[in-house]
Amino acid sequence: MAQGVLWILLGLLLWSDPGTASLPLLMDSVIQALAELEQKVPAAKTRHTASAWLMSAPNSGPHNRLYHFLLGAWSLNATELDPCPLSPELLGLTKEVARHDVREGKEYGVVLAPDGSTVAVEPLLAGLEAGLQGRRVINLPLDSMAAPWETGDTFPDVVAIAPDVRATSSPGLRDGSPDVTTADIGANTPDATKGCPDVQASLPDAKAKSPPTMVDSLLAVTLAGNLGLTFLRGSQTQSHPDLGTEGCWDQLSAPRTFTLLDPKASLLTMAFLNGALDGVILGDYLSRTPEPRPSLSHLLSQYYGAGVARDPGFRSNFRRQNGAALTSASILAQQVWGTLVLLQRLEPVHLQLQCMSQEQLAQVAANATKEFTEAFLGCPAIHPRCRWGAAPYRGRPKLLQLPLGFLYVHHTYVPAPPCTDFTRCAANMRSMQRYHQDTQGWGDIGYSFVVGSDGYVYEGRGWHWVGAHTLGHNSRGFGVAIVGNYTAALPTEAALRTVRDTLPSCAVRAGLLRPDYALLGHRQLVRTDCPGDALFDLLRTWPHFTATVKPRPARSVSKRSRREPPPRTLPATDLQ
């Protein structure tokens, strides 16, 4: 039943021309559409007619060729679903999120999820369908053009490729992975580089070792194909594709328009990567779940809610940790390479692939995988200011002189309870900003970043504005606070890992923080108990902690800032 319902929704998404929806662009609306399909469409009818909707999609681009070849489709008149099983409002929604696209600084086909993240619907649904089909595999080189859904091939051991998705302890990709070896695919693939000297000269040559032997349908239709094609375009134009560009909704309660923060962003936006990774995670889960599987509406409600099967670690908040546990960089690189090889063999051949050698494809795959694993999977998810409803900066912010040499750790003290969901964390951010602006008279919230216990970092003054977090040292380092009072207790392991590992390492990689940066607790520079005894004792064991910095003389510190502020309705937080 679940697979048939998904075929119908995929067909609706791909077949319908973009229109205007009356429903807000929320993940809850997509879940509502799935629930309505599950209720109204007979299980015996769904799979056959839904694939007709997919086949009638007007877009014949390379992504649809992958969908058709790896997921399967039948030629059937799409009007057999008349009358449409969806209400006019939900049909309007499917038209609104028909296909993912980026045009003139706007992003289409995306919705706002309950965790505050923006998610592209198309790669999410493609991943769900691939998982329902059992993660089909196609062997390379192609002996025939028979689609894998016709041969019935599946992975004999999916768990060996994708371990338990709920393992959230690993911050990065596993280094160990099975070696993939086979005969050189170049011997079985037509020479696609003849007559293309310009392309041949424009790309660095890479020795093609261990060429790909198979393509995983789940990775191909979600991540691998899009990563490969986007970085292929970048390599041919001598430019580096932007990865993970964020954006802002026109409103959070009933979002309708999503504007990217970089109008020149590539298709690999944050929303697309979120949707693709969610598709991989949930597709893998479905491929390993025996019948009867949960309904898709129920599964998505759990995943974008409290957690699948009541596991709080298995939810969208922790998609990067869970996604990183599913594969290794070497396997993903092979899948990107293999998917590009597959696209070379499908008709009509993608024009940019027509003149590419296997060595060049291998280089594109390596570059794409490195950027994805280091700049996306290996970095924390940061909600931009617009996502938590920040008020404008009062005055004119002063710019930092980057890179900086210090990272100052704080706790907010008030709010004292850790925030574990987007609604509470966003409310805490707005409350702290109001106090800092209205009571303290500062231009903005004082911290550079605030870390919640919901799996997200919240942008305060960010990487470029001087903060108001560590008196006398604001221009020398970033101030990072963890929501909560850590006098006697410690933050969650996920929050600690963010401050200790992922946030600073990504800042170093981006040239924002010096590689030899020093990490200090607030109390080392100002007479205060911040960041709390329990947290500070732990900081002293961290690699970049520096114990030799002396606190500022008492005469240069205000009386009020020498003590922790007492609890109050408005969060006092650190007073520098």
Curated annotation (Swiss-Prot):
The record marks Y447 as: Important for catalytic activity. Residues 1-21 form the signal peptide. Keywords: Disulfide bond, Glycoprotein, Hydrolase, Immunity, Membrane, Metal-binding, Phosphoprotein, Secreted, Signal, Zinc. Strongly expressed in liver and fetal liver, and secreted into serum. Expressed to a much lesser extent in transverse colon, lymph nodes, heart, thymus, pancreas, descending colon, stomach and testis. Isoform 2 is not detected in the liver or serum. Residues 550-576 are annotated as: Disordered. Disulfide bonds join C419-C425. May play a scavenger role by digesting biologically active peptidoglycan (PGN) into biologically inactive fragments. Has no direct bacteriolytic activity. Belongs to the N-acetylmuramoyl-L-alanine amidase 2 family. This is N-acetylmuramoyl-L-alanine amidase.
